[in-house]
Each structure stands twice: as C-alpha cells, then as structure tokens.
C-alpha cells in the first residue's frame, strides 16, 4: 500500500505554471513557465518543500528576434543517456504586427530542445539543439519524453490544420533526444464536452509507469476554471505507437475544487518521494476572477500532492489538496523566493 507522505506546503512554488519536477538521486530539480515568458529557469533542493526558497537560476533567455523570441512556455527537464535536456515551446515575436494572434486564435509556437552534457545541470553549457521536426509546421508545444523497453519516445501537443481544434496529442519514437525516428501518431484529440470548454485542447502530457500500466495524463479546455486533467491508459507491454493500445477516460480525472479554492488544475508532471510514493505536480489558481488576458495573470501556482493507488494498483486521482502556504491574488510579480520583489 502506498505511503501517505504529507506535502507540507502548498502551493509548492508560487507563480510558476506548467511545473516539471525531476527527482535525480536525492535532489529535486524544478522548472516551469516563468510569468514573463522570456526565460527558462532551474531550481534544485533536497526536498519538495525546499523548492520555494531554492535559488532560481536563469539558464536560457529568449532571442531578440526569430522563432524563439516570444512566449517561452512549459519547459521540461529530462535526463537521457547521462545528459540533461530541456524541451520547451517558443514563438516568433508578433508584438505590434497587424496580424498578431488574438487571445481567441492559435499561437505560433514550435518545440525546441536544450542540451547540457555536464554532470551538474547548473554547470557546463546549455546548447540549443534546435526545433524538433515533428513532420509538419503548425502550432506545437508541451513536449515530454519517456523511455519504455529501451526506446525513448516523445509526446507533444500540436495543431492539425485539417481537423477541428487547437491541439491534439501525438507520440513518436526518438532517434536521439532532439530527433524523431518515425512519423507522429495521434493518440487523442478534443472530443468530449469537458475538453472543448473555451478552447478545443489536449495539451500538457505527462507519462507515469506504475505496476505494468502506462498512465498518460493531459489537460483540456481553456486555462480558467474549466481546465482539467484526463488520462489515457495502456499496458506497459503494449505498443505505445498503436492508438488501439490506449484507453481514454471519457470524463476528467482531476478538476477544480471550490471548497479548497483550487481552480483549473492541470499541466502536470510526476515525481516521487524518498519513500517511493508517486507525487502529482500540477498548477492551479486560487481564484476565478481574471482581469484581462489570462496569460498576463501570474498566479498559476505549482502544487503537489501524493497520488495514492487502490488495491488493484489504479490511481485514486482525488481532488486538489488545500493550501498551506499563502498565495497572492494581485498581479504583482513576486521574487523567485515568493517574497514581494
């Protein structure tokens, strides 16, 4: 039976959306979307609770122009073959252009990769490995990677211009951490009512393998109170490139909870406690009234809670945990430690 190790502080990290936590040895590494969307940052701590106060180091900044000059979103850190990789989405700066996308239009992001071959990701050099060629040019974001039976895979969100919707989820095998070894295979597209509230979205994939089953979580709908998580499941012995291997939940598995003031939970990652418990890491807001462009509201906070499993080894997703750390409601940006800048 899973341990019920407490998450003593929630939010885990203030004003950081799309959180990714990687536990490597006894160290937790944390990255997420910065509220200015102009950089990629990294923290580390010996405990999850230590991440809020941990030093935040900027390892990469947006370009002055070109395809990586605007709206840097959803970095994820991975360790593959002894090197460190960060997948992230970036777009060309359309500020001031007459044809700049509005809030109701699709953005123009692509997926990019950074590599660091040093033993310590806070040392060495982060090298740009460029854009991941997914096979076609359209809005693409939220790449994650996992290994199964010796093969590395990439899962990401991308728009198919031939179908209704802003983004579907795709999977492909990898030749190396920045190159696909085969064509993209669609795993899911927005089809259920909960996935199409505001926007037709499947995004933010994360993969967990537990007791012979793969759980591919994702988020759907617009990033307000309707934002929620769904899940695809497959046997770890099945072919992950075969859509028939996967079963999709018809209803969301993790949703807003007014009783604890946690709204729009999603874009999750998974990590573990030192005791071996699975930890669900996600972002959420603590209020529903958003003034202006939701992208300019910095108060999507990284949260974490132990994910228990039932006697059959299936996740009990539950509901967002209540807060134990004060969370801001103003649009004022905090210093990385959570204090007022």
Indicate where each model-derived feature is located.
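Carbohydrate-active catalytic/glycan-binding domains of CAZyme proteins
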Residues: 1-341
């Amino acid at each position: 039976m899973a341990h019920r190790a407490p998450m003593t502080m929630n939010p885990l990290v203030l004003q950081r959306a799309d959180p990714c936590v990687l536990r490597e040895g006894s160290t937790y590494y944390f990255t997420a979307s910065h509220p200015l969307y102009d950089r990629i940052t990294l923290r580390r701590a010996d405990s999850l609770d230590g991440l809020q106060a941990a030093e935040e180091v900027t390892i990469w900044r947006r370009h002055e122009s070109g395809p990586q000059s605007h709206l840097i979103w959803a970095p994820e850190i991975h360790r593959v073959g002894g090197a460190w990789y960060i997948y992230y989405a970036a777009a060309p700066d359309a500020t001031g252009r007459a044809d700049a996308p509005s809030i109701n239009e699709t953005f123009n992001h692509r997926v990019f990769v950074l590599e660091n071959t040093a033993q310590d990701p806070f040392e060495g050099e982060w090298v740009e490995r460029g854009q991941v060629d997914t096979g076609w040019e359209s809005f693409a974001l939220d790449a994650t990677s996992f290994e199964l039976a010796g093969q590395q895979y990439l899962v990401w969100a991308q728009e198919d211009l031939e179908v209704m919707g802003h983004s579907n989820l795709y999977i492909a095998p990898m030749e190396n951490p920045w190159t696909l070894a085969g064509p993209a295979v669609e795993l899911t597209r927005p089809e259920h009512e909960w996935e199409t509230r505001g926007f037709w979205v499947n995004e933010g994939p994360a993969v967990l393998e537990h007791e012979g089953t793969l759980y591919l979580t994702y988020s759907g709908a617009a990033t307000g109170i309707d934002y929620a998580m769904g899940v695809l499941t497959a046997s770890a012995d099945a072919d992950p490139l075969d859509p028939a291997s996967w079963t999709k939940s018809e209803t969301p598995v993790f949703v807003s909870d007014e009783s604890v003031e946690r709204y729009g939970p999603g874009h999750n990652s998974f990590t573990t406690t030192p005791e071996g418990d699975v930890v669900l890491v996600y972002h959420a807001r603590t209020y529903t009234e958003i003034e202006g462009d939701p992208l300019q509201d910095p108060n999507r906070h990284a949260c974490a809670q132990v994910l228990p499993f039932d006697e059959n080894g299936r996740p009990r997703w539950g509901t967002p945990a209540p807060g134990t750390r004060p969370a801001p409601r103003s649009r004022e940006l905090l210093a990385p430690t959570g204090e007022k800048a």
